[in-house]
Amino acid sequence: MKTKKLAVIGASYLQEPLVRKAKEMGLYTICFAWADGAKCAEICDKFYDISIVEKEQILKVCQDEKIDGICTIASDVAAPTVAYVANAMGLVGNDYEAAVRANNKYLMRNAFMKAGVPCPKYMMVTPETIHTPEVIDGLRDFQFPMITKPSDRSGSLGVTKINMPSEHYPAMELAMSKSFMHEAMVEEFIEGREISVEFISYKGTHYPLQITDKVTTEAPHFVELEHHQPSTLSDEMFAKIYDITKTALNALGLTNGASHAEYKITNEGRIAIMEIGGRMGGDFIGSDLVRLSTGYDFVKGVIAVALGVFEEPKMTIGKHSGVYFLCKETEAIKPILDDWKSHPEIVQCEITDTELRNVQCSADRSGYFIYQSDKKFTI
């Protein structure tokens, strides 16, 4: 029987769980990425030193290789290339235009507004428009505080909370400098708890997997410090969030594969979806926490979608799982990482840097530990 070939877009540490799972499933893995930082080049069957945004070049190689499926995890930038190749080769994947929409916060918000999906008030700013009357007048329509962020980046990179008019332009310039398209989003700041939602979809049917409670640093950078599953939200709120997410996925046209939605919920009960990525959540949410809390192998599910052999998810356990990240702000957890083997709940631990820094983005964190237990692991 012919061994199936799976193309993986990206080869950094983020894709390592995907490549290892594919190998475990007996698949032939082909990774595409720049060689610099390509950790998966050492473990995949074949590696191509091609930028993940070079979709035409990657398509040609995939056609020559006669791949059976293509996917990525935890990478927004790779998603349009995955869709482009899948569409061109008749493989399972999202429509290319849908993947582009999900990769641009402005296009995404426009789709949400059209479909009646609750989201923050927003405005786009570019180098050409930043000093125009339209933007100057538009800024007056927002109340302080507000948020600026790149339109096409994930995580906390380039995100700033603005508290006064003098901060407008430095924050917008920063966001544009971090954007691939040099575009900044200005949006209302919503005070409330942060959650994220994991779904997997197959041919237009959406399956909810889990909701994650999040802990972040305060303004201005909002770097994530903790994730915990399942969320402590009520069953009624779970159902409401799942319904909104399905509507949002349909609004974007995302029909296949993993998705990761981020929400804010105010004390008054207002729900606002901040964004959806056409990929699973990073920070171990998709690769580890979902499996540890539900028993469902999310990574294996993503591969099954790509190969067209997906089966409806089955949740086999009901545990608590989570991750704590090490940095200057969380230095109190350092003794736990140093002695993690004495904590039976901890299933994985790594210190990546001996220096603890105040974090401005996720890359500034110096380690982590992942737990699974019958209740939330609290410190």
Q: What positions do the PLM features span?
A:
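ATP-dependent carboxylate/phosphate-activation module, predominantly the ATP-grasp catalytic core
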Residues: 166, 188-254, 258, 265, ...
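Peripheral (often C-terminal) accessory segments that flank ATP-dependent C-N-forming ligase machineries
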Residues: 114, 136, 303-379
